[in-house]
Amino acid sequence: MSEGEPKNTHFGYKTVEADKKADLVADVFHSVAAKYDIMNDVMSFGVHRFWKRHTIEVAAARPGMKVLDLAGGTGDLTAKFSHLVGDRGQVVLADINDSMLKVGRTKLRDKGIVNNVSYVQANAEALPFPDNHFDIITIAFGLRNVTDKDAALRSMQRVLKPGGKLLVLEFSTPKHELMRKVYDMYSFKVLPKMGALITKDADSYEYLAESIRMHPDQETLKQMMVDAGFEQVDYTNMTDGVVALHRGYKF
């Protein structure tokens, strides 16, 4: 690529100019925001709740801590963290998509979760928070939609306190060939049809399936976290590696 030419990236399987991907991803989540929680339950058969519960357990949030739930969407993790950090703590639900934030804010307020939660529309690649600010950062099913994942990881490392931890919960690469074949069939044949039926939007769920395949595998993401400055990076596979939880610390 010669100097001055636009940089390209992937949007699912499509190649697009890097500076246009965020808008394309935004369109997807504007479209699915209202039915996002329903689709999570349907397309994962409810298993996403187990994945998130395990993430909360590994996070080990305590009273008084500051937690950033990045790409927090409709607030599943934020709701749990709010109870754990208590009145002396703080949870920031941050998402680049205002439609998702609105759904999350309404959902949490309907549950009476108001006192220790704030909402910020933010780009993960340039987080608008001070250095060394959060004890815990989580990003669940969001990193694969970020244009510059390396920049986002560096930004998270910057705003994390020394001694703090980052948890990345994301779809990944199944360990066994049979699971990979079943998963591919489900993702590309069944998932878009579910999206069409429930949200009237098959294309968005086709993108989501493609974005999973384009996301770095477990070992690649582990190295990306190390390169961003995280230490003691490890990961746990769940559901045969359909999902992986990566953990890294800042010292």
UniProtKB/Swiss-Prot annotation:
Residues that, per the record, bind S-adenosyl-L-methionine: 74, 95, 123-124
The reaction(s) this protein catalyses: a 2-demethylmenaquinol + S-adenosyl-L-methionine = a menaquinol + S-adenosyl-L-homocysteine + H(+); a 2-methoxy-6-(all-trans-polyprenyl)benzene-1,4-diol + S-adenosyl-L-methionine = a 5-methoxy-2-methyl-3-(all-trans-polyprenyl)benzene-1,4-diol + S-adenosyl-L-homocysteine + H(+)
PROSITE patterns: SAM_MT_UBIE (PS51608), UBIE_1 (PS01183), UBIE_2 (PS01184)
Entry's Gene Ontology molecular function annotations: 2-methoxy-6-polyprenyl-1,4-benzoquinol methyltransferase activity; demethylmenaquinone methyltransferase activity
A single GO BP: menaquinone biosynthetic process
EC number(s) from the headed UniProt entry: 2.1.1.163, 2.1.1.201
UniProt cross-references to InterPro entries, sorted A to Z: SAM-dependent_MTases_sf, UbiE/COQ5_MeTrFase, UbiE/COQ5_MeTrFase_CS
Keyword Iron among record annotations: no
Keyword Metal-binding listed: no
Domain of life: Bacteria
Keywords, in A-Z order: Menaquinone biosynthesis, Methyltransferase, S-adenosyl-L-methionine, Transferase, Ubiquinone biosynthesis
First-level EC class: transferase
Signal sequence interval, chain numbering: none
The protein's annotated pathway: Quinol/quinone metabolism; menaquinone biosynthesis; menaquinol from 1,4-dihydroxy-2-naphthoate: step 2/2; Cofactor biosynthesis; ubiquinone biosynthesis
Alphabetical list of Pfam families matching this protein: Ubie_methyltran
Biological role: Methyltransferase required for the conversion of demethylmenaquinol (DMKH2) to menaquinol (MKH2) and the conversion of 2-polyprenyl-6-methoxy-1,4-benzoquinol (DDMQH2) to 2-polyprenyl-3-methyl-6-methoxy-1,4-benzoquinol (DMQH2).
HAMAP family named among the record's database cross-references: MenG_UbiE_methyltr
Recorded family membership: Belongs to the class I-like SAM-binding methyltransferase superfamily. MenG/UbiE family.
Protein name: Ubiquinone/menaquinone biosynthesis C-methyltransferase UbiE
Organism: Shewanella frigidimarina (strain NCIMB 400)
Gene expressing this chain: ubiE
